[in-house]
């Protein structure tokens, strides 16, 4: 859909030439009906996926959720009413329905553009100011920005569309047609096209270029960091199994007859892992940046007390450490770790940067797909708007109709972009379409590294 000109553009051309054959009418009706169905289905899947899969409830996906709401409005109302308009050859639903349709159409379309801008700025600041911006990047603030985007879109278009005829004292829209009255002049249409399409696209492309440059710089820094690693003899990080062997230094053997008090506790903690997971959502805030202030490579041992079932009374002595220890980064552990642990600092720093870089690239890939779809579907119509400003009769009627419908198709493509670039969306879509979501709820769902996760299970 478009925010720069009325359907079938200006009043100097006929909306749809009468006398189209039945095969043409059938083809237009079936094609546009299928596109509308695909748009509604795809964006409903986005909304349902966000509801049922908690992994998708990230700050970045809040913006995608808002974009899906705008696309759902377009697929439900705008596409079908415009198809009726085309097939009948005139507007037969009255002036009030015309103005309400245009207001809803243009508000939803402008909200789509605003949401794309929000996504672009969010990605830009996340990459260029990862510490200061992400501290302020909360769901509440994201919801506030989304609400502001919709409010601005409503204020810009709805009052002008609905009340312009009362401001000027008359309605000049031709009988049987439906278009925005104040856009009947090509020069005004040109100005709105510049403000509603060309300016936002320029800003988004500039931001994407800056994101790309910053990501490439980080990739080069990471390559240099990895190239400078020189593991020493016996250095590097030992595996967790090696560190937890009975009899190893710092982990005395557990006396026989003792058992772990926590053996039936829910599985709440996962060991810190720097392994890249494909299930990682690109907008997730559950990254390892929370330990930025901690010294890489340091660790502390969290000792899990062991209880002797034969003991008659509790003792005041501290519990002995056991092989079941969990290690996590902290500030003071490096000096206690010994000389053999020194090379782990650079290694873990490199892995943390790799993890962050992978997330940024995935997020940039989603943004690039959405931005590319937006440009490809909206540009033809807006080029025709510019041409009509200088040559009123140079654009054929059929091209106007195709160009305007191509803007609508952007709402159909967006959910496909989410699925292609985001494995979490793709898997959730598949399970919902196969009616297998309930089964998934009771199996272990892979989580991102370092996250706190309770494994779905009927048992403790």
Curated annotation (Swiss-Prot):
UniProt GO MF annotations: G protein-coupled acetylcholine receptor activity; phosphatidylinositol-4,5-bisphosphate phospholipase C activity
Topological domains, Cytoplasmic: 49-62, 122-142, 210-366, 421-460
One cellular component term from this protein's GO annotations in UniProt: glutamatergic synapse
Keyword check for Hydrolase: no
Glycosylation sites: 2, 12
Protein function: The muscarinic acetylcholine receptor mediates various cellular responses, including inhibition of adenylate cyclase, breakdown of phosphoinositides and modulation of potassium channels through the action of G proteins. Primary transducing effect is Pi turnover.
Phosphothreonine PTM sites in chain numbering: 230, 428, 455
Superkingdom field: Eukaryota
Membrane topology type: Multi-pass membrane protein
Residues modified to Phosphoserine: 451, 457
Gene Ontology biological-process annotations: adenylate cyclase-inhibiting G protein-coupled acetylcholine receptor signaling pathway; chemical synaptic transmission; cognition; G protein-coupled acetylcholine receptor signaling pathway; G protein-coupled receptor signaling pathway; G protein-coupled receptor signaling pathway, coupled to cyclic nucleotide second messenger; nervous system development; neuromuscular synaptic transmission
Complexes and interactors: Interacts with GPRASP2. Interacts with TMEM147.
Disordered: region residues: 225-256, 274-297, 310-351
Name of this protein: Muscarinic acetylcholine receptor M1
Family: Belongs to the G-protein coupled receptor 1 family. Muscarinic acetylcholine receptor subfamily. CHRM1 sub-subfamily.
Keywords from the named record: Cell membrane, Disulfide bond, G-protein coupled receptor, Glycoprotein, Membrane, Phosphoprotein, Postsynaptic cell membrane, Receptor, Synapse, Transducer, Transmembrane, Transmembrane helix
Biased composition (Basic residues): 328-343
Parts of the chain on the Extracellular side: 1-22, 85-95, 165-185, 391-397
Compartments where found: Cell membrane; Postsynaptic cell membrane
Entries under Gene3D superfamilies matching the protein: Rhodopsin 7-helix transmembrane proteins (1.20.1070.10)
Protein's organism: Homo sapiens
Entry keyword annotation includes Cytoplasm: no
Record field: transmembrane: 23-48, 63-84, 96-121, 143-164, 186-209, 367-390, 398-420
């Amino acid at each position: 859909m478009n925010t720069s000109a009325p359907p079938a553009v200006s009043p100097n051309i006929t909306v749809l030439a009468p006398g189209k054959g039945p095969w043409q009418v059938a083809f237009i009706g079936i094609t546009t009906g299928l596109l509308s169905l695909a748009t509604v289905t795809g964006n409903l899947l986005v909304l349902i996926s966000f509801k049922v899969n908690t992994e998708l409830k990230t700050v970045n996906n809040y913006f995608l959720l808002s974009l899906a709401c705008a696309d759902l409005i377009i697929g439900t109302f705008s596409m079908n009413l415009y198809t009726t308009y085309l097939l009948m050859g005139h507007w037969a639903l009255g002036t009030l329905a015309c103005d309400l349709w245009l207001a809803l159409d243009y508000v939803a379309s402008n909200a789509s553009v605003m949401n794309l801008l929000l996504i672009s700025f969010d990605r830009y600041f996340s990459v260029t100011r990862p510490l200061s911006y992400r501290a302020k990047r909360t769901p509440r603030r994201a919801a506030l920005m989304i609400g502001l985007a919709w409010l601005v879109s409503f204020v810009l278009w709805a009052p002008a569309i609905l009340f312009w005829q009362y401001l000027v004292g008359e309605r000049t829209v031709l009988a049987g047609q439906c278009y925005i009255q104040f856009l009947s002049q090509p020069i005004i249409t040109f100005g709105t096209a510049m403000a509603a399409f060309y300016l936002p696209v320029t800003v988004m492309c500039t931001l994407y270029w800056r994101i790309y440059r910053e990501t490439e710089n980080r990739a080069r820094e990471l390559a240099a960091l990895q190239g400078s690693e020189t593991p020493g003899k016996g250095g590097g990080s030992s595996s967790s199994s090696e560190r937890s062997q009975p009899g190893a230094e710092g982990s005395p053997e557990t006396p026989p007859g003792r058992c772990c008090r926590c053996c039936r506790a829910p599985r709440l903690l996962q060991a810190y892992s720097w392994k890249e997971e494909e299930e990682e959502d690109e907008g997730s805030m559950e990254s390892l940046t929370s330990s930025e202030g901690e010294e890489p490579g340091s660790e502390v041992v969290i000792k899990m007390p062991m209880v002797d079932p034969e003991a008659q009374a509790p003792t005041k002595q501290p519990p002995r450490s056991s092989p079941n220890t969990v290690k996590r980064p902290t500030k003071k552990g490096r000096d206690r770790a010994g000389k053999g642990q020194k090379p782990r600092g650079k290694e873990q720093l490199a892995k943390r940067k790799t993890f962050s870089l992978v997330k940024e690239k995935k997020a940039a890939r989603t943004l690039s797909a959405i931005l590319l779809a937006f440009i490809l579907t909206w540009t033809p119509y807006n080029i025709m708007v510019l041409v009509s400003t200088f040559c009123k009769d140079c654009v054929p009627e059929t091209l106007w109709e195709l160009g305007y419908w191509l803007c609508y198709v952007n709402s159909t493509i967006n959910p496909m972009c989410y699925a292609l670039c985001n494995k979490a969306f793709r898997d959730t879509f598949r399970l919902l379409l196969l009616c297998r979501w309930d089964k998934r709820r009771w199996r272990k769902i892979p989580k991102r590294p370092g996250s706190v996760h309770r494994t779905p299970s009927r048992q403790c």
